[in-house]
Amino acid sequence: GIADCAGAPVVAVTADAYDQARAAAAKVVVEYEELTPVLDIEDALEREQYTYPPQIMTYGDPDASIAAAPRRIKGELRCGGQDHFYLESNIALAVPRDDGDLDIYSSTQHPSEVQHGVAHTLGVPSNAVTVEVRRMGGGFGGKESQPTIIAAIAALMADITGRPAKLRLRRDDDMIVTGKRHDFLFRYEAGFDETGRIAGVDILMGMRSGNVADLSPGVLARALCHADNCYYLPNARLSGYPCKTNTVSNTAFRGFGGPQGMIVIE
């Protein structure tokens, strides 16, 4: 297999106590063949490396309207990422039942996705997996899709050992291996008149999707659809590129692409 980002799961270790498991995991030696990574948005754009096809919205004639405008502006803008920093890190408990089914206790915003992911991992029907969310110590989008792999690993260990298994990420590990708010690179050009009325815009949005798509399609679509904000754009080309990089996949975050789309027009 290929570990295509820092924090990619390679091996799971079980023990009777949390500290024992961490100590054992620290003794694992993995030999890697180094590949050339793509770490930033510019490299991914240059290589045309995306997690799914680009999204391009065009209406009117942006090229002609910008060229004919008495005034023009052109530039580049960056919008950084952000960690959710929920108080409770990702955690899951998997408990085998006497009838062969499995109970999962997960800190998740999306129990049905956890159910589907665990069932797929174990090769069992979804009705063999029951997911319960007793409480959740914060989420903000960070526990919409990300808890699935945590629960799947715990479930796999429980299935192998026949005993309850819990996987709890330390804060530093959680920040390394889970996705964040998508960071963006914007390249824009706009034409307007002396009163500030916009004639046309051409906006490129390069979004760091990470190593897999995750929820990037919806985030990028919302960023594109929020790019006009409160302004009337008679002619526009809005191009969104979900850049595939060797970094952990970014994910849902409050606003879900809307804030990134709005900041570029401002």
Can you say where each PLM-predicted feature lies in the sequence?
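Structural alpha/beta core scaffold segments of enzyme domains
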Residues: 1-266
